[in-house]
């Protein structure tokens, strides 16, 4: 909401006071009828409105709104405040927080949540109130015997808690899509272990492509009859590396005479391999 007095504020003005500042420079000034440093906190009885109506009553703020409000007693001779509103009630949550200034106890902060309906079956909402009151407020109001007024002024900060449900849900969806994409990429690749290096080959390739992979290792070694396949045919290891050194050396001299039968032996796995017809035997 654009504040009614925003034109009187300097450019870039932000109102984010600390708990101590709210007590010492705003609530205390209001309680003693002194002008506040900035007059942007209106005087409104917040219990006469539902919380979603209050932003329209605020002087300043987009995500949180401040108000000076009185508090009335729930019972004539009691000290409990009346928390009832138009269509619900405010319920205290957590423990009160003591506020100090220069190691001196100066105020109390209480957190409340708005519930729709009547207690004890009210429906919890996302509207939150932080209520600030002076530490000596009880001693002042105790003199007002017979009056329903409990406090002349307390300071309230009201805001709506952000709903993170949709954000978390979107993060899960994006994570699932990323996992599905990774699985699809893995299924379209074949992992070949031929020594210290591991590489992945596409399912469809030509024999000329294999011959160009000089970094892959010895082609005849890979095409030998001593390769061991697992049950899925994806991982291949040379069983007799020691005994076949001479054989491998001899086969390296005949690389150009590789036939399509050897190629079929090398790619003997469940998914068919498409070999460039140029290299098929005539």
Curated annotation (Swiss-Prot):
Disruption phenotype: In plants lacking both NAP1 and NAP2, delayed leaf senescence but enhanced fruit yield and sugar content, likely due to prolonged leaf photosynthesis in aging plants. InterPro entries: NAC-dom, NAC_dom_sf. Gene3D superfamilies: NAC domain (2.170.150.80). It is found in: Nucleus. Induction: Accumulates during age-dependent and dark-induced leaf senescence. GO terms for cellular component: nucleus. It comes from the Eukaryota. GO terms for biological process: leaf senescence; regulation of DNA-templated transcription; regulation of reproductive fruiting body development. Its main location: nucleus. The keyword DNA-binding applies. Transmembrane segments: none annotated. Residues 161-188 form a coiled coil. Pfam families: NAM (PF02365). Residues 9-161 form the NAC domain. Residues 106-167 bind DNA. One of its GO terms (molecular function) is sequence-specific DNA binding. Expressed in roots, stem, flowers, and leaves. Keywords: Coiled coil, DNA-binding, Nucleus, Transcription, Transcription regulation. Transcription factor that binds DNA motifs 5'-CGT[AG](5N)NACG[ACT][AC][AT][ACG][ACT]-3' and 5'-CACG[ACT][AC][AT][AGT][CT]-3' in target genes promoters. Promotes leaf senescence and reduces fruit yield and sugar content, probably by establishing abscisic acid (ABA) homeostasis. The NAC domain includes a DNA binding domain and a dimerization domain. This is NAC domain-containing protein 1. It comes from Solanum lycopersicum.
């Amino acid at each position: 909401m654009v504040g009614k007095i925003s034109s009187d504020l300097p450019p870039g003005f932000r109102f984010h006071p600390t708990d101590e500042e709210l007590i010492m420079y705003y609530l205390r000034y209001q309680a003693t009828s002194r002008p506040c440093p900035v007059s942007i906190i209106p005087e409104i009885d917040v219990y006469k409105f539902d919380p979603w109506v209050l932003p329209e009553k605020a002087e300043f703020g987009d995500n949180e709104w401040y108000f000076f409000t009185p508090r009335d007693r729930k019972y004539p001779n009691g000290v409990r405040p009346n928390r009832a509103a138009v269509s619900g009630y405010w319920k205290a949550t957590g423990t009160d927080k003591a506020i100090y200034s220069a190691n001196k106890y100066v105020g109390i902060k209480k957190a409340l949540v708005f519930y729709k309906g009547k207690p004890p079956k009210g429906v919890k909402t996302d509207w939150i109130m932080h209520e600030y009151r002076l530490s000596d407020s009880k001693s002042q109001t105790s003199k007002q015997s017979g009056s329903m007024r409990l406090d002349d002024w307390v300071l309230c900060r009201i805001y709506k808690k952000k709903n993170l449900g949709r954000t978390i849900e979107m993060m899960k969806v994006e994570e699932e899509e990323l996992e599905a994409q990774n699985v699809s990429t893995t299924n379209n690749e074949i992992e070949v272990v031929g020594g210290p290096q591991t590489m992945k080959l596409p399912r469809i390739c030509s024999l000329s492509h294999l011959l160009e992979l000089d970094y892959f290792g010895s082609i005849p070694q890979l095409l030998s009859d001593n390769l061991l396949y697992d049950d899925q045919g994806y991982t291949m290891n040379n069983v007799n590396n020691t005994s076949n050194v001479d054989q491998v050396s001899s086969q390296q001299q005949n690389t150009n005479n590789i036939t399509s039968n050897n190629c079929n032996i090398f790619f003997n796995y469940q998914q068919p391999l498409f070999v460039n017809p140029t290299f098929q035997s005539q």
